Design a protein with these regions (language model features):
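Conserved, well-ordered active-site substructure
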Residues: 5-7
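Conserved NTP phosphate-binding and transfer environment spanning the P-loop NTPase/kinase superfamily
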Residues: 16-17, 24-189
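Glycine-rich phosphate-binding P-loop
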Residues: 1
Length: 189
């Protein structure tokens, strides 16, 4: 039986678009002991803000590059790219302790690990691919995972939304030869 531990102690998330409706637990996790990068600061109450958090940019704001601006006016200006200016960088992030998450499992820090019953490779696709489907066996699942394609995000250099081959939806994190990486997955099964 395969057991797993979580080698991380928290969540690293993209801030823009995260709100109480889109991801309540992620937002709740950021309420204390959290590091934010490249978000806007609401100078009136010393809180953070990003696009998609709510529809009310702070009037007294410091945008992600450090300029003090009226957030409502700033976000209504169309930039050189033909889009409204952003108070937060499109790839702004938060890092929050997992213990802050309202739904964290009591087994989260079990030193013996927890039994694995499924592995999900989470690529980003706006269309044409089912959100979830099940493989026939470990080898088939490894093959399917290796064939995942994802659309680029603000985290990647270049245009956003471009489809690229993204093995196991882990391309930015595969630190060695991808063939060896795939062989490792096959060997584990």
């Amino acid at each position: 039986r395969l057991y797993a531990i979580n080698p991380e102690n928290g969540f690293f998330g993209v801030a823009p678009g995260t709100n109480a409706k889109s991801n309540y637990n992620a937002l709740a996790s950021t309420m204390k002991n959290t590091i934010f990068t490249n978000v806007a600061l609401n100078n009136a109450d010393n809180t953070v803000w990003w696009e998609g958090l709510d529809k009310n940019p702070p009037e007294d704001a410091t945008e992600w590059k450090g300029a003090k601006v009226n957030g409502k006016e700033y976000t209504s200006v169309i930039g050189a790219d033909g889009k409204p200016q952003k108070l937060a960088h499109p790839n702004s992030r938060f890092t929050a302790p997992a213990v802050n998450c309202p739904c964290v499992s009591p087994e989260f820090n079990n030193p013996n690990g927890v039994p694995v019953s499924a592995i999900i490779f989470g690529g980003r696709r706006a269309s044409t691919t089912p959100l979830v489907y099940q493989s026939f066996d470990w080898t088939h699942g490894t093959y399917i995972g290796s064939a995942v394609s994802s659309e680029t995000t603000a985290a990647a250099v270049g245009a956003v939304g471009v489809l690229r081959h993204d093995p196991m939806a882990m391309k930015p994190f595969i630190g060695y030869n991808v063939g060896d990486y795939w062989a490792h997955w096959l060997e584990m099964g």
